[in-house]
């Protein structure tokens, strides 16, 4: 096994951070720890509660054979701000590229409060690499800060923003559709997003808010990728978390679930909001591997390949080839 690299090289990303934010005082005290011990990578923000890669296999009954093993990496709820600095986002991008996904899906809330955050975070995300490209939808914070400005910034980085639209993916002679909708309450139009997709065609929907899963299930969507909930962000022992007002948000807080024949994965996200704290709810980078489902309905729950909730985790267990 070749040598492993610390993520990111400190001088390189510190220079980027200083370029966009100046030399921060508070940010220096909130910087994440980087260490490499015994062939394992630790990437843990002491306030953010750690970062893990969740590798999970998803069985889809309508997935064509040509997309067997297709890997989707999901990044959600980045919330770039003073408390989620650019060097942390850059580290996540570099880690994501090491996982060599077929598609990167960005499920919204790139920024928290400031329009000045849009261009810098978009430039960092422009470094994402995937065989089938990078697709994105916008979240509620993105619409509050400036949806058009963010969409333009992402497009300049060759990131396709699916605003009530869809895209056709082709692989080994097979078709797979990826649709995306604007956020719930900000113009989400599922009918427009899937218009033109053949009936019964395998379709993956990107929707920032899991409240849209019921509508997706009614329309036969195969898989929904969402975020928004942060997994609760702070998880109290015994009490758990109380998040959201809708039945969908209360039920679909994090991880894999299903509603009828429609499966959903809700990412805990990589950032924080309101307070720079995660407790008993580490940030995550989901890596979802799709497989054609050829079993009976009772066995349709996904097979867990590996969960990496808490750093350190071994890069070799995730199939990451070192340089």
What function would you assign to each model-found segment?
Residues 40-48, 75-88, 111-116, 142-146, ...:
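Acidic/histidine-rich helix-loop elements
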Residues 152, 156-159, 163-165, 171-207, ...:
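Binuclear metal-dependent hydrolase catalytic cores centered on His/Asp/Glu-rich metal-binding motifs
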Residues 81-170:
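Core catalytic region of metal-dependent phosphoesterases/phosphodiesterases
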Residues 1-71, 82, 316-323:
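Acidic, histidine-bearing metal-coordination/catalytic regions of metal-dependent phosphoesterases
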Residues 210-289, 294-296:
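Conserved beta-sheet core of the metallophosphoesterase superfamily
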């Amino acid at each position: 096994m070749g040598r492993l690299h610390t993520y990111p090289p400190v001088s390189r990303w510190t220079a980027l951070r200083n370029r966009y934010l100046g030399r921060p005082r508070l940010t220096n005290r909130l910087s994440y720890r980087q260490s490499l011990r015994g062939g394992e990578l630790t990437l843990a923000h002491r306030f953010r509660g750690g970062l893990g890669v969740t590798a999970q296999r998803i069985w889809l009954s309508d997935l064509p054979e040509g997309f067997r093993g297709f890997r989707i990496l999901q990044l959600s709820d980045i919330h770039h701000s003073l408390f989620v600095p650019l060097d942390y986002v850059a580290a996540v991008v570099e880690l994501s590229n090491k996982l060599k996904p077929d598609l990167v899906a960005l499920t919204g809330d790139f920024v928290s409060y400031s329009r000045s955050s849009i261009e810098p975070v978009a430039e960092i995300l422009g470094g994402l690499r995937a065989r089938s490209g990078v697709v994105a939808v916008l979240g509620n914070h993105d619409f509050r800060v400036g949806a058009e400005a963010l969409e333009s910034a992402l497009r300049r980085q060759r990131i396709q923003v699916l605003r009530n639209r869809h895209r056709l993916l082709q692989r080994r002679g097979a078709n797979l559709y990826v649709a995306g909708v604007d956020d719930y309450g900000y113009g989400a139009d599922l009918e427009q997003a899937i218009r033109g997709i053949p009936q019964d065609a395998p379709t993956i929907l990107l929707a920032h808010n899991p409240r849209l899963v019921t509508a997706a299930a009614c329309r036969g969507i195969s898989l929904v990728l969402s975020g928004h909930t942060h997994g609760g962000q702070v998880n109290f022992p015994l009490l758990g978390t109380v998040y959201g007002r809708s039945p969908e948000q209360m039920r679909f807080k994090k991880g894999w679930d299903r509603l009828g024949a429609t499966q959903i994965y809700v990412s805990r996200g990589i950032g924080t909001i309101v307070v720079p704290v995660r407790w008993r709810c580490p940030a995550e980078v989901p890596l979802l591997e799709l497989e054609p489902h050829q079993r009976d309905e009772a066995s349709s729950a996904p097979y867990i390949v590996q969960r990496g909730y808490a750093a350190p985790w071994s890069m070799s267990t995730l199939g990451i080839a070192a340089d």
